[in-house]
């Protein structure tokens, strides 16, 4: 699963991965996890938005927002975030990506994700930072006996 929705200053992205590390013996969790990147209002400062990473370690069929999860702040006081996804098939950047819909990119991951964040510098001016993350796996992982 890889779902990314754009259209505002702060897009949301949610994907499943086998990258969770189980740290305690007999923990009721596995290496499978769902990661989300989204914004949250800073509870200590008004009108401040933080970019956070959410990890849901125990998967279920409930809505993701209703399940317990760990939140880690990635960037404090972010002004904007832009996510773009490189489609090797179309040779173009896409604003959204959804592997769960038949009219989306079913069974296909982007080869790269371009992440651009806007923050305020020490002079209170917008400052943009951009990087790209390469996704090495493009094919779905199917467990067919």
Show where each model-derived region lies.
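Extracytoplasmic beta-strand-rich oligomerization domains located immediately C-terminal to a leader/signal peptide
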Residues: 1-63
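Short linear sequence signals and composition-biased patches located at protein termini or domain-edge surfaces
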Residues: 75-145
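Short coil-to-beta-strand transition motifs
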Residues: 31-32, 69-77
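A general secondary-structure boundary signal
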Residues: 34-36, 69, 130-134
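Short helix/strand-bridging catalytic loops that position acidic/His residues to coordinate divalent metals
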Residues: 62-70, 98-101
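A short, structured loop/turn motif at beta-sheet edges
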Residues: 8, 39-47, 73-80, 107-109
């Amino acid at each position: 699963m890889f779902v990314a929705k754009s259209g505002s200053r702060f897009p949301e992205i949610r994907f499943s991965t086998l990258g969770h590390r189980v740290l305690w013996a007999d923990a009721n969790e596995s290496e499978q996890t769902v990661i989300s990147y989204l914004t949250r209002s800073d509870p200590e400062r008004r009108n401040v938005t933080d970019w956070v990473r959410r990890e849901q370690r125990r998967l279920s069929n409930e809505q993701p927002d209703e399940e317990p999860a760990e939140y880690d702040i990635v960037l404090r006081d972010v002004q904007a975030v832009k996510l773009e996804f490189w489609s090797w098939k179309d040779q173009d950047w896409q604003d959204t990506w959804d592997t769960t819909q038949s009219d989306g990119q079913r069974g296909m991951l982007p080869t790269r994700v371009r992440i651009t964040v806007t923050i305020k510098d020490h002079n209170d001016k917008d400052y943009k930072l951009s990087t790209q993350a390469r996704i090495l796996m493009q094919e779905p992982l199917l467990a067919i006996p």
